[in-house]
Amino acid sequence: MNAQSPDGAPQDERTAELAARLERVHQRIEDASRRAAREKPELIVVTKFHPAEDVRRLYSLGVREVGENRDQEASAKASELVDLEGLSWHFIGQLQSNKARSVVRYASAVHSVDRDSIATALSRAVLGERENGGRADLDVLLQVNLDPAAEEQTRRGGALPASLPALADHVAVLEGLRLRGLMAVAPLGADPRPAFEWLHRLSGELQAAHPEATLLSAGMSHDLEDAIACGATHLRIGTDVLGPRPPMG
């Protein structure tokens, strides 16, 4: 039988594996930040497809920011892990308006707002939750499409850059939301550096109109160094911390 830490996390080979992986990622972040002469960004560990037990293990290793792509999975994990004080859930996947009410029950931030209707739905959901308790404002990042020339079926979501000013203005006046910055994914199969440099310029333009929108969510396992060099404040790292997706069933 595996022993457990005081917070309920199993002390086993998997915990040791996660600790080693996490240490390697932290070292990459530290090295890249030093080379770029930038402050170390926050690490969001993307736990999609991995069990709640792994999130508990990560918590025991000091992780307090986790990211999820699918509401059904995230909601179940958040409910199971409600005892983990200070654990913050970031919703980073494509969001449908009819899922907004569920998402605001557990998420501290949504990184994937790319149209007015999603923002409006989130605002209404936050206000609805406030009727039942003390729901704080929801941090919102606008997802920008850095590959607008891509075929529709290959896009990873996001607002076109030209539409960002109007979307930002819309979010900024919605009650219950805090406009905090931008999120993007580098185009598939392309050098991420030019895309992240573009994202950094867009971030500067956004901050000129909305000074509080200082966050830049960019960089995953394969391109975190480029993201850091271009000013990322938050990294979304999954595979390099958790390993390959576990088998289904």
Label for each model-derived stretch:
Residues 232-249:
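Gly/Pro- and small hydrophobic-enriched strand-loop and loop-to-helix capping segments
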Residues 2-222, 228-230, 242-244:
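Conserved alpha/beta-domain cores
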